[in-house]
Amino acid sequence: MTFKDLRDFIAQLEQRGALKRIQVPISPVLEMTEVCDRTLRAKGPALLFEKPTGFDMPVLGNLFGTPERVALGMGAEDVGALREIGTLLAQLKEPEPPKGFKDAWAKLPMYRKVLSMAPKVLKDAPCQEVVEEGDDVDLGRLPVQTCWPGDVGPLITWGLTVTRGPNKERQNLGIYRQQVIGRNKVIMRWLSHRGGALDYREWCQKHPGQPYPVAVALGADPATILGAVTPVPDTLSEYAFAGLLRGHRTELVKCRGSDLQVPASAEIVLEGVIHPGEMADEGPYGDHTGYYNEVDRFPVFTVERVTRRQKPIYHSTYTGRPPDEPAILGVALNEVFVPILQKQFPEIVDFYLPPEGCSYRMAVVTMKKQYPGHAKRVMLGVWSFLRQFMYTKFVIVTDDDIDARDWNDVIWAITTRMDPKRDTVMIDNTPIDYLDFASPVSGLGSKMGLDATHKWPGETSREWGRAIVKDEAVTRRIDELWSSLGID
């Protein structure tokens, strides 16, 4: 499935019966969350609210509410095909030297395709068909959702934030929630280790006191949005990766007020600056944990300019206790992670991030164990190899006879193959999600690894239990007789 922009994607989803237009007036304050939540839990379609109460701008919700739609957004026809994307990323992250001329020739098309996907910069773009500046800027015209009863106010959720560090050519794309606090001001809630926050910190060090340019694209095409949340190697820009997913180069346009480049087909772009030292209290908001987060201070983004398409579509979502849209994204992106991990750790058979664990706080790994202590090496590798797992609190490692995605199997392995003292690894003072109020200090907490593998000599002095296995001949005979027994 290929598409040129968000509108093309919407049209193709509608042709497939995977998008529903809602013509009944629905309020962005609480009501859209209720409708989207019920639809997502029923594995229903994407929703285009054509008459949001109090606004004349349609709202797109539940766009990535099923793993299948995430796959379509990444240019794949099914979720299983996402493993191929993971294999490509693994090759780009850790390229292997060719084994000979034939191997080099075979790999050449892949690298040539990557090199050919550099973004294309346009002079004119749909996202700049309408320009509002200065006193004409009014974020109150956007149908920004207020998702939960305890939320402090409207929250921009699907904004693609574009930044650049002072010493970098490559731009960073990140998705950070933004609390609307005024006609032209939002709070930029980026965590300290995220790309945008790092770029901003470097800017403040090199240009103290000077305003920092930022742009936020709303309603970019799905490949660009999903490229921003995928573990793209540092050698590959998110824009180039989006081109690979889409099958053609990402088209960009230079912002009107800075050198930042934004997706040319975006529905809405917010341009402006962060004034160093201007901070505000952010929150509380209901979040993907299922709780309201505590109030914390973050930089204020002053919007100097809004550019947009004619009759734009506002793309939004809500976050709450799983399942929610981020959890569904996690289920799909899980398939991308597997080949990347297997490239570094070939002994890994499967890797699973349960959506119930907020899609990143717990991981289950199955592996082909080869020596004593092997499980501990793998769990430490999971924590350190990809920054996406920096906040994973629990890593469960077990043997390849266990289905990582079946809790009955996993719990059986934990309760029969673990000694709590010997097989539990505790690591203190590690990075933890700021939203994790269970940690004793904001942003710093502990991690637990559970070794639920069979134990080898050296790990135990006892004879290890032998698993019960059925007699295959008896199983075949009963299979043949089963229908005659009248049991079901």
Curated annotation (Swiss-Prot):
Prenylated FMN binds at residues 175-177, 189-191, 194-195. It comes from the Bacteria. Keywords: Cell membrane, Decarboxylase, Flavoprotein, FMN, Lyase, Manganese, Membrane, Metal-binding, Ubiquinone biosynthesis. Signal peptide: none annotated. Mn(2+) binds at residues 172, 238. InterPro entries: UbiD, UbiD-like_C, UbiD-like_N, UbiD_bacteria, UbiD_Rift_dom. Pfam families: UbiD, UbiD_C, UbiD_N. SUPFAM superfamilies: FMN-binding split barrel (SSF50475), UbiD C-terminal domain-like (SSF143968). It catalyses: a 4-hydroxy-3-(all-trans-polyprenyl)benzoate + H(+) = a 2-(all-trans-polyprenyl)phenol + CO2. It is an enzyme of class 4 (lyase). One of its GO terms (molecular function) is metal ion binding. Pathway: Cofactor biosynthesis; ubiquinone biosynthesis. Binds 1 prenylated FMN per subunit. The active site is at 287 (proton donor). It is a peripheral membrane protein. The keyword rRNA-binding does not apply. It is found in: Cell membrane. NCBIfam families: PRK10922.1, UbiD family decarboxylase. HAMAP family: UbiD. Catalyzes the decarboxylation of 3-octaprenyl-4-hydroxy benzoate to 2-octaprenylphenol, an intermediate step in ubiquinone biosynthesis. Homohexamer. PANTHER family: 3-OCTAPRENYL-4-HYDROXYBENZOATE CARBOXY-LYASE-RELATED, FERULIC ACID DECARBOXYLASE 1. Belongs to the UbiD family. This is 3-octaprenyl-4-hydroxybenzoate carboxy-lyase. It comes from Pseudomonas paraeruginosa (strain DSM 24068 / PA7) (Pseudomonas aeruginosa (strain PA7)). The gene is ubiD.
